[in-house]
């Protein structure tokens, strides 16, 4: 999954405009990494601890808690993806974001990559609301990262290039999710599945209008599913 894969997969994504030299450098990925690091640093300052930063006021206000979403705090569906619990958590996710994202951003383009990232993040959060404990605190960019895994896999499938390494990475991470305590299976699988659907629209649909429409419909479906589920609990 190194830079060499950019040259082989760039032709897999339909695009109309020729690429400029500036388009070969990732911009969104470094910005996302910087934003995640800044949020982590702020929670650590508030909590006065790198390890126990979940005690920060910002963390409590932004973390995904299905019960809080039911009370109208819908922003948590996205803000939770920029929170991390401890240095190891953010280090692993930011490394994965960089390794996966630097190539995908160049291949998909900045706007489509950011859309894939955010829709995958929303998919992971939706799965937590639908299937996890309603009073559970969930945080992290892992749902979005799993969506990027799906994105890279589908790009390679589209180009008919070997994708066994990506499948192995996905399986390994799912196994880790299952065996390591405290990791949200719902969030990871939700990001993987929803990211796959979003990536399929971006990779296989030829017209930008169709791509945008598919992502909007997917987003609306996720929000409707959450709203219906929460209404049924009331």
Residue ranges with predicted function:
Residues 90-97, 139-151, 183-203:
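Alpha-helical transmembrane segments that form the membrane-embedded catalytic/substrate-binding core
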Residues 106-107, 152-167, 203-215:
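Alpha-helical transmembrane bundle and helix-membrane interface signal
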Residues 117-120, 165-174, 214-221:
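Central hydrophobic cores of alpha-helical transmembrane segments
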Residues 25-141, 181-183:
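N-terminal TM1-TM2 helical hairpin plus the immediately adjacent luminal interfacial "cap"
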Residues 1-21, 178-234:
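C-terminal transmembrane module of polytopic alpha-helical membrane proteins
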Residues 68-70, 76-77, 169-193:
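Short alpha-helical packing/oligomerization segments
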Residues 38-42, 123, 127, 131, ...:
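Alpha-helical membrane-inserting segments
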Residues 37, 78, 118-122, 144, ...:
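Residue-level signature of the transmembrane alpha-helical core
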């Amino acid at each position: 999954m190194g830079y060499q894969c950019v040259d082989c997969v760039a032709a897999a994504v339909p695009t109309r405009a020729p690429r400029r030299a500036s388009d070969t450098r990732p911009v969104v990925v470094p910005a996302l990494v910087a934003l995640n690091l800044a949020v982590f640093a702020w929670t650590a300052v508030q909590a006065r601890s790198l390890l126990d930063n979940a005690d920060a006021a910002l963390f409590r206000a932004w973390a995904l808690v299905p019960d809080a979403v039911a009370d109208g705090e819908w922003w948590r569906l996205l803000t939770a993806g920029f929170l991390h619990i401890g240095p190891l958590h953010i280090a692993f996710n930011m490394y994965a974001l960089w390794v996966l994202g630097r190539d995908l951003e160049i291949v998909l383009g900045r706007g489509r990559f950011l859309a894939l990232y955010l829709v995958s993040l929303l998919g992971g959060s939706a799965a937590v609301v639908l299937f996890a404990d309603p009073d559970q605190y969930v945080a992290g960019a892992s749902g979005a990262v799993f969506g990027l895994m799906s994105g890279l896999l589908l790009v390679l499938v589209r180009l008919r290039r070997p994708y066994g390494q990506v499948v192995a990475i996905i399986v390994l991470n799912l196994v880790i999710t299952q065996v390591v305590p405290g990791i949200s299976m719902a969030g990871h699988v939700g990001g993987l599945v929803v990211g796959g659907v979003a990536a399929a629209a971006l990779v296989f649909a030829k017209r930008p209008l169709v791509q945008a429409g598919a992502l909007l419909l997917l987003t609306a479906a996720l929000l409707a599913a959450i709203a219906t589920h929460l209404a049924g609990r009331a």
